[in-house]
Design a protein with these regions (language model features):
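Signature for phosphate-centric chemistry
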Residues: 27-163, 167-337, 341-432
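Bacterial Sec-dependent N-terminal signal peptides
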Residues: 1-28
Length: 432
């Protein structure tokens, strides 16, 4: 696909010309005007990936801070970058074994042959790398770190101390390493303290109890799945020269197609070209996206059905953010607190902080129209809280989600996307 190169080009261009600074308010985090999820997926079929979608960097702007305010501290939480599958029996391994006899028999169509050859490539790239960060994931975090440094240079001019903490899971530790390596490349004088350990999991990756909090979600998702039966016939005509002959090689059409969808979603994380979407009708992979999109939001975000019970589970992470921000405001001399974790805690965090769009409260029927998982919880998704102070000691905070200025639903800003820290702190501490 034409996917990562334009993103990389955009990052290089932004680094070359600098970030746009104007007096605009925060960027709209919903769907572009006049477009919906189907439109976005037709533009780029890899957007069916949801939380397996690679990071999309878009050109952005910075609203000027009020006169006299200078950035002095950043509080950050980042999901690990692109990874291989975390389950056993990866889809591409299963499909390679299943399709090899048909490939050797010469009954695959040109689309089917292309798919098989890319499946073989995925097996080679992913061999011995289950659950691991990929080179794409390393690149994502290095680029995010570089942009953060160049965007807020004044933070790191005032202080060189950076604390980084990670989930104990390898892909998070390596994401932390990639991010901090890029920061050090920007400024070798930075004093970066990196650690991981079980003690940090209590807030970085705290999801205990979410199953009980969202009891009933399975029933809703099963009903939705039943109401949207999948076409498991059309792919035979696309992948085989003779669909009837192809059926003899496929034992379970539904599971075969499910594995094909997994390959379509994961190939981008492994840096393998996508040829899989062309082997399925649009409706098949769109409906698969919709089911996963609804599942992610319903179980881990601020849903109307379960949000009041699910979101408070993220309180330890919010407490850590507030405590470390208070210390920075009090003058502990730290430039940034960095945290590297997972998608589920980050989704709950956006709901707890009440971030506009990504953390909004929607009912099950609204999810696909309001919340696009492929943007909202893609690989390397991140939150950056940037703190500003004037000579009088007044502190403002700007929230960036995936590097874009983002508003708080339930709180009036001081100006543009800037909030008074004392008001924002109080709002977050009193939620739930």
């Amino acid at each position: 696909m034409k996917h990562y190169r334009p993103i990389l080009a955009a990052a290089i261009l932004s680094a070359a010309i600098g970030f746009h600074t104007n007096d605009s308010y925060a960027q709209n985090y919903g769907y572009p005007e006049g477009k919906n999820a189907a439109d976005l997926i037709r533009e780029d079929t890899l957007r069916t990936g949801n939380n397996h979608h690679i990071y999309e960097y878009v050109d952005l702007h910075d609203t000027r801070a009020p006169k006299g305010y200078k950035a002095f501290y950043i509080s950050h939480y980042g999901r690990h970058g692109s990874r291989t599958d975390h389950r056993g029996n990866e889809a591409w391994v299963v499909l390679e074994k299943e399709l090899r006899p048909a490939y050797e028999a010469g009954i695959l169509s040109w689309k089917g042959r292309q798919a098989y050859e890319k499946i073989v490539e995925m097996c080679e790239v992913g061999d011995g790398m289950r659950e691991m960060l990929t080179p794409v994931g390393v690149r994502e975090h290095k680029e995010i770190a570089g942009r953060m440094y160049r965007r807020f240079r004044e933070v790191f001019r005032q202080s060189k101390e950076v604390e980084a903490r990670s989930s104990t899971v390898q892909r998070c530790v390596l994401s932390m390493g990639a991010f901090c390596t890029a920061l050090a490349a920007e400024d070798p004088k930075l004093d970066i303290d990196l650690l991981t350990g079980q003690r940090y999991m209590d807030y970085i990756a705290h999801t205990t109890g979410y199953g009980e909090a969202t009891a009933g979600s399975d029933k809703m998702l099963k009903a939705y799945k039943k109401a949207h039966p999948r076409d498991t016939v059309s792919f035979f005509a696309l992948m085989f020269n003779d669909p009837a002959e192809g059926r003899a090689f496929i034992k379970d059409a539904y599971h075969f197609e499910s594995n094909l969808i997994d390959c379509a979603n994961y190939c981008q994380c492994l840096g393998v070209e996508d040829v899989f979407h062309r082997c399925m009708p649009f409706e098949v992979y769109y409906d698969a996206w919709s089911l996963k999109n609804r599942s992610l939001y319903l179980v881990h975000c601020n849903s109307a059905e379960f949000g009041d019970k699910r979101i408070p589970i993220g309180k330890p992470l919010v407490d850590d953010i507030i405590a470390k921000a208070d210390a920075a405001v009090a003058g502990n001399g730290r430039a940034a607190d960095l945290r590297f974790g997972h998608d589920y805690p980050l989704m709950a965090l956006t709901g707890y902080l009440d971030l506009q769009g990504v953390g909004g409260r929607y009912s099950f029927d609204e999810i696909d129209d309001k919340w696009f998982g492929s943007w909202n919880i893609c690989m390397a998704s991140n939150l950056q809280l940037v703190f500003y102070r004037n000579r009088s000691g007044d502190v403002l905070v700007k929230c960036l989600y995936n590097e874009r200025e983002t508003l708080i639903n339930g709180l009036e800003p001081f100006y543009g996307p800037y909030y008074r820290w004392d008001e924002l702190r109080k709002y977050w501490m009193e939620r739930f």
